[in-house]
């Protein structure tokens, strides 16, 4: 079979040096060299070529084809006069060289074959230079591609979907956490409210002194210059004389004293009599006891303010003599039965300094200190109540408002609700009993249409007459959240007042974030130490978990405003060390340069509800229906519900919703495409070319391994022969 002339570059005849030395003359050597160029001439010549058998007789054993010491290498002579070299018969180095040359001839990479086929050194140098330039340019581009990929950039796609949006969970709470009529039986709460009342009274006195403007008080045409005006003194109630501890300043000649109504006088010399109004808790004016005189007045008004003489022009028949008590100058008199007991203000206000069941350390633990700002005092009192009620959740539930007492009427999608089944109780430390609508995760609820008629409409009764003195506002706390999320009404809630219908229009947004390495969001589920068990992870819950861990570690107790960890007992309300430690670390965690930092990532999947709010007066005068559990006349019920009830509407403003999804801006596929594009542009290399290089490396490794194995076998045979 004629295979055609072989490529001359594929063959190189290299006689074994041992064979070369056996040639008898120079003519035989020249004939041997001519063998690689003209096989037919050599066969026809009369050259005295050594017989192979003659050579072989000098060896005691046969040689391996891979042996470096072999003196004869046999190559195939083709029919058309060419040589087809068997690479397995070449020496180790020649075999590697032969493989590299063959790779240069056959590779699909651009430029490399030009090196193997270069006719001279200059031609080869030019191609080496071109290959280096292209390789450098490719490396620069490859580095830029890799750096772009390592940035892990992402893009946010915004889509507006017109589909049925799931209705969220709605949490409803009374702004008053506990019923005043019930909670006062709690010993700790009774102490806290007593101290709170006293501190608020002192703060009011301080505010009144600070706002003194010398207002004149006029009675019967007689002007009295007031040294100070008490809080609420402009609102006249019913006055009566009352004993109080006082500080008197007699230098200004007015003989007027400053009352200290919450302090018990140490002696009779420190006691004075004041005109006291129970409605406003004002005690003014005050004078020493000896400056007041029991007498008879001719005119007293409905506020029990009297004058010794009747006004001019008053008929004798209209003059009514009333028992009264007047200060020495007779300018100020109060109606008073002489035999009646005089009220002691320190007993009326329940002087906190005289509490036999509360120690100094306990009072200090409450944290009121020298507070004079009423807003700050109320905030601290609310915190103290949370601490005092932290022991038993069952007790908190009983002292807070029950479900049917709060929720009177309800409808969803225009149909009545089942209050027992549709609302679930959640005990919140700040707001007491809260009730969640649409809590069941297995039941899908959605609005049929947009608008208030197809959302949640609920009427709530808060019973303002049973509010704690620390409850500053009357109304409802509402939180809109996903079913899987804890509501956090103290952080994310909205307040709705009584006497109004409050409308909350919603729009839903779904967020889908990328996890690492493109972002640092927390994937579905919760972290191992998340304190809100049974709820999905949220950033707020993470911060509270982090803070709770800090408090437990530093203070040895847990913050009662958050769920505890590992059964650790909450910090006690009257434990001074607990309260000071908690307050210290609460301030530290909020400092910019604080030593303790909480790192909380966003959840990868999150549903956000944006809300718009509007309100209108409710109920209207035309609403002549029986509201809730009111059994009075319609007008009376309307008035009662204006003060104690609120109407809420929660609905979708539109049935479409936004989907914000993050995606990788430059992923691995794009990187490989750009990488391959630059590789093909500058080097002409493809994936198949890379496979060629891989095969070359594998062949070279295989040759190296087999060579070392063969060498080891030869050494062993030689050692065995020598020993023999």
UniProtKB/Swiss-Prot annotation:
<comment type="similarity">
    <text>Belongs to the amiloride-sensitive sodium channel (TC 1.A.6) family.</text>
</comment>
<protein>
    <recommendedName>
        <fullName>Degenerin mec-10</fullName>
    </recommendedName>
</protein>
<comment type="function">
    <text>Amiloride-sensitive sodium channel subunit required for mechanosensory transduction (touch sensitivity). Negatively regulates the turning step of male mating behavior.</text>
</comment>
<keyword id="KW-1003">Cell membrane</keyword>
<dbReference type="InterPro" id="IPR020903">
    <property type="entry name" value="ENaC_CS"/>
</dbReference>
<keyword id="KW-0813">Transport</keyword>
<dbReference type="GO" id="GO:0005886">
    <property type="term" value="C:plasma membrane"/>
</dbReference>
<feature type="glycosylation site" description="N-linked (GlcNAc...) asparagine">
    <location>
        <position position="294"/>
    </location>
</feature>
<keyword id="KW-0325">Glycoprotein</keyword>
<dbReference type="GO" id="GO:1905792">
    <property type="term" value="P:positive regulation of mechanosensory behavior"/>
</dbReference>
<keyword id="KW-0915">Sodium</keyword>
<keyword id="KW-0406">Ion transport</keyword>
<comment type="subunit">
    <text>The channel is probably composed of at least the mec-2, mec-4, mec-6 and mec-10 subunits.</text>
</comment>
<keyword id="KW-0716">Sensory transduction</keyword>
<dbReference type="Pfam" id="PF00858">
    <property type="entry name" value="ASC"/>
</dbReference>
<keyword id="KW-1133">Transmembrane helix</keyword>
<feature type="glycosylation site" description="N-linked (GlcNAc...) asparagine">
    <location>
        <position position="605"/>
    </location>
</feature>
<feature type="glycosylation site" description="N-linked (GlcNAc...) asparagine">
    <location>
        <position position="463"/>
    </location>
</feature>
<dbReference type="Pfam" id="PF22214">
    <property type="entry name" value="Mec-4_10_cyt"/>
</dbReference>
<dbReference type="InterPro" id="IPR004726">
    <property type="entry name" value="Deg-1"/>
</dbReference>
<dbReference type="GO" id="GO:0015280">
    <property type="term" value="F:ligand-gated sodium channel activity"/>
</dbReference>
<dbReference type="InterPro" id="IPR054001">
    <property type="entry name" value="Mec-4/10_cyt"/>
</dbReference>
<dbReference type="GO" id="GO:0044298">
    <property type="term" value="C:cell body membrane"/>
</dbReference>
<keyword id="KW-0472">Membrane</keyword>
<feature type="transmembrane region" description="Helical">
    <location>
        <begin position="126"/>
        <end position="146"/>
    </location>
</feature>
<feature type="topological domain" description="Cytoplasmic">
    <location>
        <begin position="706"/>
        <end position="724"/>
    </location>
</feature>
<feature type="topological domain" description="Extracellular">
    <location>
        <begin position="147"/>
        <end position="684"/>
    </location>
</feature>
<keyword id="KW-0739">Sodium transport</keyword>
<feature type="glycosylation site" description="N-linked (GlcNAc...) asparagine">
    <location>
        <position position="624"/>
    </location>
</feature>
<dbReference type="GO" id="GO:0007638">
    <property type="term" value="P:mechanosensory behavior"/>
</dbReference>
<keyword id="KW-0407">Ion channel</keyword>
<dbReference type="GO" id="GO:0035725">
    <property type="term" value="P:sodium ion transmembrane transport"/>
</dbReference>
<keyword id="KW-0894">Sodium channel</keyword>
<dbReference type="InterPro" id="IPR001873">
    <property type="entry name" value="ENaC"/>
</dbReference>
<keyword id="KW-0812">Transmembrane</keyword>
<feature type="topological domain" description="Cytoplasmic">
    <location>
        <begin position="1"/>
        <end position="125"/>
    </location>
</feature>
<feature type="glycosylation site" description="N-linked (GlcNAc...) asparagine">
    <location>
        <position position="370"/>
    </location>
</feature>
<dbReference type="GO" id="GO:0050976">
    <property type="term" value="P:detection of mechanical stimulus involved in sensory perception of touch"/>
</dbReference>
<feature type="transmembrane region" description="Helical">
    <location>
        <begin position="685"/>
        <end position="705"/>
    </location>
</feature>
<dbReference type="GO" id="GO:1905789">
    <property type="term" value="P:positive regulation of detection of mechanical stimulus involved in sensory perception of touch"/>
</dbReference>
């Amino acid at each position: 079979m004629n295979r055609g002339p072989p490529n001359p570059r594929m063959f190189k005849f290299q006689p074994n040096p041992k064979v070369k030395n056996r040639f008898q003359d120079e003519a035989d050597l020249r004939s041997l060299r001519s063998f690689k160029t003209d096989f037919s001439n050599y066969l026809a010549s009369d050259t005295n070529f050594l017989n192979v058998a003659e050579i072989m007789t000098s060896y005691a054993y046969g040689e391996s084809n891979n042996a470096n010491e072999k003196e004869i290498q046999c190559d195939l002579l083709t029919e058309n006069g060419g040589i087809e070299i068997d690479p397995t018969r070449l020496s180790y180095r020649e075999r590697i060289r032969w493989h590299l040359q063959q790779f240069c001839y056959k590779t699909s990479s651009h430029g490399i074959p030009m090196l193997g086929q270069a006719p001279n050194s200059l031609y080869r140098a030019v191609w080496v230079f071109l290959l280096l330039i292209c390789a450098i340019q490719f490396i620069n581009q490859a580095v830029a591609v890799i750096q772009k990929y390592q940035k892990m950039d992402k893009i946010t796609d915004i889509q507006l979907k017109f589909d049925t949006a799931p209705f969220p969970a709605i949490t409803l709470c009374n702004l008053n956490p506990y019923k005043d009529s019930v909670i006062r039986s709690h010993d700790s709460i009774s102490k806290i409210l007593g101290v709170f009342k006293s501190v608020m009274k002192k703060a009011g006195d301080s505010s009144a002194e600070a706002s003194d403007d010398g207002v004149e008080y006029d009675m019967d045409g007689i002007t009295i210059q007031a040294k100070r005006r008490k809080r609420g003194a402009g609102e006249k109630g019913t006055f009566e004389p009352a004993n109080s501890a006082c500080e008197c300043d007699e230098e200004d000649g007015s003989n007027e004293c400053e009352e200290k109504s919450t302090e018990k006088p140490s002696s009779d010399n420190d006691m004075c009599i004041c005109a006291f109004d129970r409605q406003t808790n004002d005690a003014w004016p005050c004078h020493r006891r000896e400056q007041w005189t029991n007498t008879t007045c001719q005119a007293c008004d409905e506020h029990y303010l009297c004058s010794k003489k009747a006004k001019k022009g008053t008929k004798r028949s209209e003059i009514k003599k009333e028992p009264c008590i007047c200060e020495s100058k007779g300018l100020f008199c109060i109606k008073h039965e002489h035999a009646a007991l005089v009220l002691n203000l320190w007993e009326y206000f329940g002087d906190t300094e005289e509490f036999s069941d509360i120690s100094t350390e306990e009072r200090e633990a409450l944290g009121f200190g020298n507070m004079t700002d009423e807003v700050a005092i109320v905030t601290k009192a609310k915190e103290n109540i949370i601490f005092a009620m932290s022991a038993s959740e069952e007790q908190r539930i009983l002292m807070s408002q029950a479900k049917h007492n709060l929720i009177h009427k309800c409808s969803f999608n225009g149909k009545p609700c089942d209050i027992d089944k549709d609302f679930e109780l959640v005990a919140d430390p700040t707001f007491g009993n809260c009730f969640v609508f649409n809590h069941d995760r297995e039941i899908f609820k959605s609005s049929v249409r947009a608008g208030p008629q197809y959302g949640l409409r609920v009427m709530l009764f808060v019973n303002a007459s049973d509010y704690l003195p620390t409850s500053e506002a009357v109304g409802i706390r509402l939180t809109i959240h996903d079913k899987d999320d804890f509501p956090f009404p103290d952080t994310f809630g909205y307040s709705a007042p009584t006497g109004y219908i409050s409308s909350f229009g919603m729009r839903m947004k779904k967020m889908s974030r990328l996890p690492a390495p493109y972002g640092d969001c927390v994937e579905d589920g919760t972290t191992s130490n998340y304190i809100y068990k049974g709820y999905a992870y949220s950033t707020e819950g993470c911060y509270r978990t982090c803070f709770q861990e800090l408090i437990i570690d530093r203070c040895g107790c847990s913050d009662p405003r958050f769920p505890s960890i590992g059964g650790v007992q909450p910090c006690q309300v009257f434990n001074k060390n607990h309260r000071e430690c908690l307050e210290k670390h609460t301030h530290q965690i909020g400092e910019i340069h604080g030593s303790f930092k909480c790192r909380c990532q966003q959840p990868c999947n999150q549903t956000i509800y944006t809300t718009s709010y509007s309100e209108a007066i409710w109920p209207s005068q035309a609403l002549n229906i029986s509201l809730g559990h009111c059994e009075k006349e319609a007008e009376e019920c309307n008035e009662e519900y204006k003060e104690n009830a609120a109407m809420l509407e929660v609905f979708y403003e539109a049935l479409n919703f936004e989907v914000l999804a993050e995606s990788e801006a430059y992923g691995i596929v794009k990187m490989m495409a750009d990488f391959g594009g630059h590789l093909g542009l500058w080097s002409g290399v493809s994936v198949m070319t890379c496979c060629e290089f891989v095969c070359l490396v594998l062949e070279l490794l295989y040759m190296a391994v087999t060579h070392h194995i063969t060498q080891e076998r030869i050494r062993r045979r030689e050692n065995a022969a020598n020993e023999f």
